[in-house]
Amino acid sequence: MFIYDTKLKQKVPFEPLVEKKANIYVCGPTVYDDAHLGHARSAIAFDLLRRTLELSGYEVVLVRNFTDIDDKIINKALKENKSIQELSSIYIESYTRDLNALNVKKPSLEPKASEYLDAMVGMIETLLEKNIAYQISNGDIYLDTSKDKDYGSLSVHNSSIEFGRIGLVQEKRLEQDFVLWKSYKGDNDVGFDSPLGKGRPGWHIECSSMIFKTLALTDTPYQIDIHAGGADLLFPHHENEACQTRCAFGVELAKYWMHNGFVNINNEKMSKSLGNSFFIKDALKNYDGEILRNYLLGVHYRSVLNFNEEDLLMSKKRLDKIYRLKQRVLGTLGGINPNFKKEILECMQDDLNISKALSVLESMLSSTNEKLDQNPKNKALKGEILANLKFIEELLGIGFKDPVEYFQLGVSGSEKQEIENKIEERKRAKEQKDFLKADNIREELLKQKIALMDTPQGTIWEKFF
């Protein structure tokens, strides 16, 4: 298994800290609004990583957090006259619903920052005791990055650009020093009583503390195997996480760092701050979650994905082929490539090489369909073909529906009944040799984007886009 390590900037063999076990931490959302397609892409990318590792024989523990203490949450809660707990719980539920619709496996653990305040305070106290952290006059506590000789080694950032983004605090020793603890500033602020005084943790300390309490190994030079997240988190968030872990515990946070690429809308990075977010819940109004998942996984996870609906509909053809084969093989079958599972898994073991994996998948679908055409009554290999389809489901998280359900997506129960009534009316017309009426019914349904197919078992129908 090979993965691309952001820190080394190259593909490297995956060699876990404990043989055949992988512990992964993925940065989750800050829950002040609904999740957008950028969040979906990150969740799907590392869901693919998890599935690939599991099918390669690894025992995987994947932790994905919720940041439920943050300035954006506080500001929106004040605006909506809610507590931060009320507001964050709304968006945690929304995010969970969205990811369920995208068939993303539930993490082993989903810690909330608010549940680990003691661990955060303890880590800050350690940094103060080591004289690596310092307090300024307003009570805020910062980490002195000059005490970490490896600061910047992960992101290799452009300091003139990135440090300007942090903002200037006059009492900071260095511009890149980052806040560990924000003291309580008054009635419109949120604070928790602690040995550090009333206040709340900074963003970066939250993830490091949750990793330490939920995943970290002892007696190893790294706390976890893989730390993952979106490319926008590389600096300052992941750089600062790595720094404070080295400073507090004397070990590296993660052996490997993995980052997924952006989702662009009109060639601009999609983000809430830019106001061009495409929320998952809105996309799900137009497209089934499996169709969205299939599209978002179709571009290599490190590449930028330029979202457009034309490409989404083109990618749906791949799903159609999977379900068309599944539909055929449930009744008949032919020969298949016996090495299919091995070949597609090897593609994913090469830094999740999805384009190569999808090429193997396309080849299998085409060759199997050709053999079904040549020998439609051969049932000897039915179990093996269905096993291959099941393997696709487990590896890529697609192809898990019944074919009838898939091809009738987007049609309500009452609409289905109307279509069935029309099919029955057409059947009677054909029996009465009124072929003009039968053709008119077919054309009428085609205008509603309903295609009819006559089979030996009767007429079946599909919704098309």
Curated annotation (Swiss-Prot):
Q: What is its main location?
A: cytoplasm
Q: Which CDD domains match?
A: CysRS_core
Could you list this entry's UniProt keywords, alphabetically sorted: Aminoacyl-tRNA synthetase, ATP-binding, Cytoplasm, Ligase, Metal-binding, Nucleotide-binding, Protein biosynthesis, Zinc
State the compartments where it is located: Cytoplasm
Residue ranges of the motif 'KMSKS' region: 269-273
InterPro entries according to UniProt: Cys-tRNA-ligase, Cys-tRNA-synt_Ia_DALR, Cys-tRNA/MSH_ligase, Rossmann-like_a/b/a_fold, tRNA-synt_1_cat_dom, tRNAsynth_Ia_anticodon-bd
Under the cellular component aspect of Gene Ontology, which terms does the record hold? cytosol
**This chain belongs to which protein, by name?**
Cysteine--tRNA ligase
Obligatory cofactor(s): Zn(2+)
Q: How does it assemble?
A: Monomer.
NCBIfam families the UniProt entry points to: cysS
Gene encoding the protein: cysS
